């Protein structure tokens, strides 16, 4: 303020008598008041502090600029005192019933008043002032009807800066002001065009749209206020010039005043303008249509915004997934058993590069190569091996063990998958198919009632054909196409609608879709559209014959081991790898609270589907064993192998009615397993429980590499566990001590007390590697003394009464 040499007239706060609130300016509220000492009605704008507005007003003096009287400088009371415009703001006048009296002369007079006031600010004031917030609310009507420009709170001296902050109200703001770009005085020209549009249409600019929406429409879509088609041409041209996107093309206020004067001399313009003003009902629909279009555009924008947010969310998830994948080392090839030392070197490099302590682990890749670690050796490495190689950090050892375990798990899961790219030079794979005949019977149950309106019906689908055909049906879907009925999908028989449907509509049909399992090569599904008609007699069923071409699973692998997906795999190495994984899973699951799998009796079968499945797996020759332990290789050609295995695994082994005997119903089956147990169970127990020699255990003449490596890693049973689970027939006199040796189960260690007896049994191994076992039948007295309840408890596969 001192730079301009302005001296303010200071008015005491007590010298003012305040009345009602007249509205608000840019940075304060305006009140009507009486300047007591001067006996003058004034307007007082209360402020938190005196800023640039008083500085600007103090140097301005024009008929169309609000007159400045002085300031209030009594803390905390600060304010600006100006003349009072008794007729209110131009905005209030336009949006009231008084605006209906406006005519061509009225509009021209007021348009000229505003233009002259703005021309004074730009060209004739002591310092050029850019208002930047010109709008109908900041134009007031004095008592004599003259328009005066007020509220300079957003104004700037042009020689101070031309880069303005975001101020003003969006519908009146020029695009460069909205974007906070450097501005010139023509930004006020844009606002003047909006004020002139308000006087012509007596409408609120961009009514119903939010400020930011208007800003987006003006800047991004280059939208402007609608100029009605019946608007006089001279006014329309002036508005278009004021709203040019390029600020340099807009006219100055000197040019606008000249245009208004020429329009006043046009004798035809008054009639055109008055006709336009009085026929507002005809052209108002054009403005409303534009507003509706802009609102729809805004709604589409909101929808696109939500869509973009959803896409951004999905991209973030995808980015996170890629980040997680990037932390997984790249594999030289999926056939880990064929990895060379260089392949292992590459894998370790990828692994240590992803770790946090990559600098400390950078030399480990060379360490693996120096120790000649190939793919087969890599998957069998243990903690002691890593220490022997020179990896002493416990954290680094855990890091490598976790990576190797994950690599082993992934390899075993993918072992039986066929290659994506087949070798053209190799032998063609056997592709066996079998044909299953199936007849699908479609019909519906009908309760006739009195007619089609109150009858009840429901659709069904039956099957006839080969017994195994039902195992190839994945699901059956009934679609009635009724508005209040849902699509019914069933995965197991009986395939019939659960609820009755009341009434039969005209041309009522039901679309039945039968989907087959993945091992059905053709067809993948069968569709049938069944017509529902009302008839008191039994409706005729429709039969559709289907031939299913079944792709036989693992048939070529069982008949020809060389045709497996990985024929070059080392069976002994894979068996060792599988046994190691089973042992690691066993140690992890011993701490779980499952009463059966967590008990000391089942350390070996903790990761098996059922006891029977584990026994069958133990009896299967090595050449037919699959790596995945949850599939029974002896039934690999059966299409229902997974379903049966899953059903067996769901049995509760601890329940009374679902013991091991429930897994085999026929006596011949139990006898067959009894014969096998005599020949194989003792042999397996001896080889699995032989004491280890050295770190990896000693190799016996008849033991497999996998069993000799893990021979010393099974848990011994405590005496309390044996005493708890013994059958009552074991509680005999001390003379029967030699008959209290419990029946061994494959994979279970011998009791410490019976270890010496096991050694004796091992010493009696015959030439073929089988163990001689003498069985003694109970006397008639012992058998008769056994209760029926005890007989039931002891009658299950896996336990033998001595």
Swiss-Prot record:
Phosphoserine-modified residues are where? 2-3, 7, 165, 275, 302, 567, 587, 593, 599, 634, 638, 649-650, 661, 685, 720, 727, 733
Write down the superkingdom of origin.
Answer: Eukaryota
User: Residue ranges under compositional bias (Low complexity)?
Assistant: 643-666
**What does the UniProt entry report for the null mutant?**
Knockout results in fully penetrant lethality at 9.5 dpc due to severe cardiac edema and growth retardation. Embryos show polydactyly of the feet. Defects in stress-activated protein kinase signaling cascade in response to ribotoxic stress, leading to impaired activation of the JNK and MAP kinase p38 pathways.
> EC annotation?
2.7.11.25
This protein's record includes keyword Transport: no
- Residue numbers carrying N-acetylserine: 2
Positions of post-translational Phosphothreonine modification: 161, 586, 628, 744
Protein location: Cytoplasm; Nucleus
Q: Where is this region: Disordered?
A: 624-802
List of catalytic residues: 133
How its function is modulated: the record gives: Activated in response to stress, such as ribosomal stress, osmotic shock and ionizing radiation. Activated by phosphorylation by PKN1, followed by autophosphorylation on Thr-161 and Ser-165.
Which Gene Ontology terms describe the biological processes this protein takes part in?
A: cellular response to gamma radiation; cellular response to UV-B; cytoskeleton organization; DNA damage checkpoint signaling; embryonic digit morphogenesis; GCN2-mediated signaling; intracellular signal transduction; JNK cascade
Read off the PROSITE patterns from this record.
PROTEIN_KINASE_DOM, PROTEIN_KINASE_ST, SAM_DOMAIN
**Bias regions of kind Polar residues — which residues?**
624-642
Please provide an example of a Pfam family that matches this protein in its UniProt record: SAM_1
Q: Which GO terms describe its molecular function?
A: ATP binding; JUN kinase kinase kinase activity; magnesium ion binding; MAP kinase kinase kinase activity; protein kinase activator activity; protein serine kinase activity; protein serine/threonine kinase activity; ribosome binding
User: Reaction catalysed by this chain?
Assistant: L-seryl-[protein] + ATP = O-phospho-L-seryl-[protein] + ADP + H(+); L-threonyl-[protein] + ATP = O-phospho-L-threonyl-[protein] + ADP + H(+)
According to the entry, every stretch annotated as the SAM domain falls at 339-410
For ATP, which residues are the binding ones? 22-30, 45
State the oligomer form and interacting partners.
Homodimer. Interacts with ZNF33A. Component of a signaling complex containing at least AKAP13, PKN1, MAPK14, MAP3K20 and MAP2K3. Within this complex, AKAP13 interacts directly with PKN1, which in turn recruits MAPK14, MAP2K3 and MAP3K20. Interacts with EIF2AK4/GCN2; promoting EIF2AK4/GCN2 kinase activity.
Record's family? Belongs to the protein kinase superfamily. STE Ser/Thr protein kinase family. MAP kinase kinase kinase subfamily.
Q: Which PANTHER family match?
A: MITOGEN-ACTIVATED PROTEIN KINASE KINASE KINASE 20 (PTHR44329:SF288), SERINE/THREONINE-PROTEIN KINASE TNNI3K-RELATED (PTHR44329)
Q: What is this protein called?
A: Mitogen-activated protein kinase kinase kinase 20
Which species does this protein come from?
Mus musculus (Mouse)
**Gene that this polypeptide is encoded by:** Map3k20
């Amino acid at each position: 303020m001192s730079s301009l040499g302005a001296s303010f007239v200071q008015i005491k706060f007590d010298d003012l008598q305040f009345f009602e609130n007249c509205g608000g300016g840019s940075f304060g509220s305006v009140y009507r008041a009486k300047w007591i000492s001067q006996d003058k009605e004034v307007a007082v704008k209360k402020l938190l502090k005196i800023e640039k507005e008083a500085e600007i007003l103090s140097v301005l003096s024009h008929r169309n600029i609000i007159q400045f009287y002085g300031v209030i400088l009594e803390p905390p009371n600060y304010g600006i005192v100006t003349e009072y415009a008794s007729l209110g703001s131009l905005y209030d006048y336009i949006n009231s019933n008084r605006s209906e009296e406006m005519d061509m002369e009225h509009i021209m007079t007021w348009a000229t008043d505003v233009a002259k006031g703005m021309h004074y600010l730009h060209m004739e004031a002591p310092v050029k002032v850019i208002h930047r917030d010109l709008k109908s609310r900041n134009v007031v009507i004095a008592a004599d009807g003259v328009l005066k420009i007020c509220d300079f709170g957003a104004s700037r001296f042009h020689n101070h800066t031309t880069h303005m902050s975001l101020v003003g109200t969006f519908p009146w703001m020029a695009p460069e002001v909205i974007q906070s770009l450097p501005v010139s005085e023509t930004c006020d020209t844009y606002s003047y065009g909006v004020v002139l549009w308000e006087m012509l249409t007596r409408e609120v600019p961009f009514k119903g749209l939010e400020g930011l929406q208007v800003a987006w429409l003006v800047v991004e879509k280059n939208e402007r206020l609608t100029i009605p088609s019946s608007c006089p041409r001279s006014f329309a041209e002036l508005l278009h010039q004021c709203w040019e996107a390029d600020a340099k093309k807009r006219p100055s206020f000197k040019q606008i005043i000249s245009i208004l004067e020429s329009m006043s001399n046009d004798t035809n313009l008054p009639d055109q303008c008055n006709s336009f003003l009085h026929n507002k009902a005809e052209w108002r629909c054009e403005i409303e249509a534009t507003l509706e279009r802009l609102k729809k555009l805004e709604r589409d924008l909101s929808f696109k915004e939500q869509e973009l947010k959803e896409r951004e969310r999905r991209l973030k998830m995808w980015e996170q997934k890629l980040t997680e994948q990037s932390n997984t080392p790249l594999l030289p090839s999926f056939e880990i058993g064929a990895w060379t030392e260089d392949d292992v070197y590459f894998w370790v490099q990828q692994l240590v590069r992803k770790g946090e302590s990559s600098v400390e682990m950078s030399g480990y890749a060379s360490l693996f190569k120096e120790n000649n670690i190939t793919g087969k050796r890599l998957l069998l490495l243990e903690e002691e091996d890593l220490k022997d190689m020179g990896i002493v950090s416990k954290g680094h050892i855990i890091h490598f063990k976790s990576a190797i375990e994950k690599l082993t798990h992934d390899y075993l899961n993918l072992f039986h998958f066929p290659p994506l790219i087949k070798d053209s030079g190799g032998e063609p794979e056997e592709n066996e198919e079998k044909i299953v005949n199936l007849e699908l019977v479609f019909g519906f149950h009908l309760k006739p009632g009195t007619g089609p309106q109150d009858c009840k019906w429901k659709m069904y689908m039956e099957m006839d054909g080969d017994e195994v055909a039902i195992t190839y049906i994945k699901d059956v879907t009934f679609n009635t196409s009724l508005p209040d009925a849902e699509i019914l999908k069933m995965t197991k028989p009986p395939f019939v609608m659960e609820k009755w449907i009341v009434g039969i509509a005209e041309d009522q049909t039901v679309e039945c879709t039968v989907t087959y399992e993945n091992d059905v090569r053709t067809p993948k599904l069968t569709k049938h559209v069944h017509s529902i008609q009302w008839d008191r007699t039994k409706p005729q069923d429709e039969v559709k014959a289907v031939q299913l071409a079944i792709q036989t699973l693992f048939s070529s692998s069982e008949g020809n081991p060389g045709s497996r997906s990985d024929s070059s795999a080392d069976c002994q190495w894979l068996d060792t790898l599988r046994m190691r994984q089973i042992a690691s899973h066993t140690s992890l699951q011993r701490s779980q609270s499952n009463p059966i799998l967590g008990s000391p009796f089942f350390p070996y079968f903790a990761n098996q589907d059922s006891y029977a499945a584990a026994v069958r797996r133990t009896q299967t020759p090595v050449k037919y064993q699959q790596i995945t332990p949850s599939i029974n290789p002896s039934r690999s050609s059966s299409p229902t192998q997974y379903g049966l295995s899953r059903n067996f695994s769901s049995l509760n082994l601890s329940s009374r009615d679902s013991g091991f005997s429930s897994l085999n119903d026929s006596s011949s089956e139990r006898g067959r397993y009894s014969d096998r147990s005599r020949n194989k169970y003792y042999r397996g127990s001896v080889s699995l429980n032989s004491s280890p020699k050295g770190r990896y255990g000693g190799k016996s003449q008849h033991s497999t590499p996998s069993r000799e490596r893990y021979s010393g890693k099974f848990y011994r049973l405590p005496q309390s566990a044996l005493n708890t689970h013994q059958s009552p027939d074991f509680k005999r006199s001390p003379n029967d001590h030699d008959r209290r040796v419990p029946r061994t189960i494959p994979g279970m260690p011998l009791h410490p007390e019976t270890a010496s007896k096991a050694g004796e049994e091992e010493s009696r191994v015959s030439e073929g590697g089988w163990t001689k076992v003498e069985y003694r039948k109970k006397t008639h007295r012992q058998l008769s003394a056994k209760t029926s309840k005890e007989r039931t408890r002891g009658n299950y596969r896996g336990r033998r009464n001595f």
